[in-house]
Amino acid sequence: MLQLLSGNPRTVDALGFLLAFALTALMDSVFHDKLPHDHGRAFAVNGELSKGKARGSGLIFVLCIALVTLAVVPFKAEYVIYTVLLIASMLSGYFDDAAETAWNEYKKGLIDLVIAVVAGVTYLNFNGTEVNFLSWSFSLPYAVYLILIIVLIWASINVVNCTDGVDGLSASVAVVTIGTYLLAYKTELAEYGTAGVVFMGALLAYLWSNAKPSSLLMGDAGSRAMGFFIAMLSLKCGHPFAFLLAAIVFIVDGSLGILKISLKRFLHISILKLSLIHISEPTRRSY
């Protein structure tokens, strides 16, 4: 482990960032033609332009992140569990990306719920129920905090997933969001801050191929994993309410997107056709 080779956390962070960037860039190049291809989104902004592009790069950069963090983050049971859940959230999106018929929202929502419950129980088992809000610190009843954690993780996965759809948008906002946590809570995050640096390195490598005009898309495999990771940063920094500010772009854009699609599908009402904010469909309609 690189932690054993250097006592300087900044050196470890730098090495982790460079490894994640280089490995992701290399794997994107090697496996680009082996990924499933996008068929466009029914209600996404310029969704037809995505047709034919390689989709599911999230599979590549999430696995690269997992491998690099094994080298730079101390081996602890809690982090290993979160890494398994990160991969699970990625796989749920990747299998949907690769499916001939898109998974319905209820199926993916149930998978997200299971992941959120396991992550919530794990977090409370290792960290307790203390919460920080501004300058105050207090404890919540176990059941109450567990419910709030489940809501946070489930919502984060879905609003981030909904924001994906425009070249470079979702990954760029994720880099800014993760960077915000690192600037504000690097000490509190400890090794999770290092994981955040690794995540940013992988995303920046992905953006090399995703910046407009893109040739590669992360798909649900990437966006769902990003949502899970951002939620875990919110919890591990000890300030879960910081999510409301750090992820404000995801919250606004994703929530409006979910509202738009819900009204379109269930009430046949079309709104927000033109907006200064990107509003995308959270899932594919049909292939």
Feature map (PLM): residue ranges:
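"…together with the soluble PPM/PP2C metallo-phosphatase catalytic core" -> "…together
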Residues: L2-V252
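Active-site-proximal helix/loop capping residues that flank conserved catalytic or ligand/cofactor
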Residues: D33, A202, G257, I277-H278
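Charged/polar, solvent-exposed surface patches and flexible loops
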Residues: D33, H37, I261, E281
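Short alpha-helical segments used as structural interaction elements across diverse proteins
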Residues: G52, E105, G257, E281-P282
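Membrane-proximal soluble regions of multi-pass membrane proteins
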Residues: F250, G254-I277
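Single conserved hydrophobic/aromatic residue that forms the stacking wall/gate
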Residues: I277-H278, P282-Y287
